[in-house]
Design a protein with these regions (language model features):
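Glycine- and acidic-residue-enriched helix-capping/strand-helix junction motifs
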Residues: 16-32
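Flexible glycine/proline-rich
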Residues: 90-234
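Short beta-strand segments
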Residues: 9-12, 75-76, 104, 123-125
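Residue-level signal for inorganic ion chemistry
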Residues: 9, 40, 74, 179, ...
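N-terminal small/polar loop signature for handling phosphorylated ligands or for N-terminal nucleophile
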Residues: 35-86, 90-95
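A general structural motif
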Residues: 27-32, 53-59, 101-110
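Short glycine-rich anion-binding loops that position phosphate/pyrophosphate groups of nucleotides
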Residues: 14-15, 78-81, 126-128
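Short, small-residue-biased leader/transition segments that mark boundaries at the very start
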Residues: 2-7
Length: 234
């Protein structure tokens, strides 16, 4: 199996615009398509991007086409519990074998993985940071292992580092924050402002090279505290 041959990435959503298209009310630009396709290419996978509107029949037809010419499919959007989140039903209609549905963390909890005709399909949240975080944590390790480039486990090295900035919100469940690590320290963008860490926020991701892990039940964290850091691999 030449697993890096082609990896297609399909974004769903009738509200999405391609870069360069004129913005209109109710529309958003397809940040996920650019961001995550670039990351997959950076890790050595050949990627072709596709977009599909919110039409179950069209999504079924596109996935059937994609699965004939690629080794794996990664999608963003259409996977939660909204009225137009059709991917779980679409996968069921394709006879998909579930691998898992949902992850106990924030962001990215709606993520699911399945196999269709033996090929991996990963469905990520449509929120940019949620998609980026789960791509790093789950998708890349699985694809690298399938390609014979990773023996087992997660590719994100874990270290303990000291916070130079805090985070003002308690974490009921496992939470992952974008952050910037340097030496033995790590900084959380936004000076502890929880609003800067919305799963839909892009600006706070600029320059980030790791995730800070806050376990379920954690309270707010302050500068000087030691935290677990998962560093991105390049």
């Amino acid at each position: 199996l030449e697993f890096r041959r082609v990896l297609f990435r399909s974004a769903t959503g009738s509200e999405l615009l391609a870069p360069g298209e004129n913005w209109a009310p109710g529309k958003i630009y397809d940040a996920n398509g650019i961001q995550n396709a670039a990351r997959l290419r950076q890790m050595g996978f050949a990627v072709q991007r596709r977009h599909c509107s919110d039409d179950p029949a069209l999504i079924v037809a596109e996935l059937e086409e994609l699965l004939t010419g690629c080794d794996a499919v990664v999608t963003s959007g259409g996977v939660s519990v909204g009225q137009k989140d059709y991917l779980p039903v679409v996968l069921e209609s394709l006879g998909a074998e579930p691998v898992f549905s949902g992850v106990a963390q924030k962001p990215g909890s709606p993520m699911l993985a399945a196999k269709v005709e033996g090929k991996l399909v990963f469905c990520l949240s449509g929120n940019p940071f949620a998609a980026a975080a789960t791509l790093e944590q789950y998708v890349l390790p699985a694809l690298l292992r399938a390609a014979g480039r990773l023996e087992k486990g997660c590719i994100l090295p874990r270290t303990k580092r000291t916070l130079t900035t805090g985070f003002s919100k308690a974490s009921k469940g496992n939470r992952y924050l974008r952050a910037k690590a340097s030496g033995g320290t790590v900084a959380i963008p936004g000076e502890g402002n929880a609003e800067a860490h919305s799963s839909g926020s892009l600006s706070a991701m600029i320059g980030c090279n790791c995730l800070v892990e806050l376990p379920a039940g954690s309270g707010p964290v302050k500068p000087g505290e030691e935290v677990e850091v998962l560093s991105f691999v390049y």
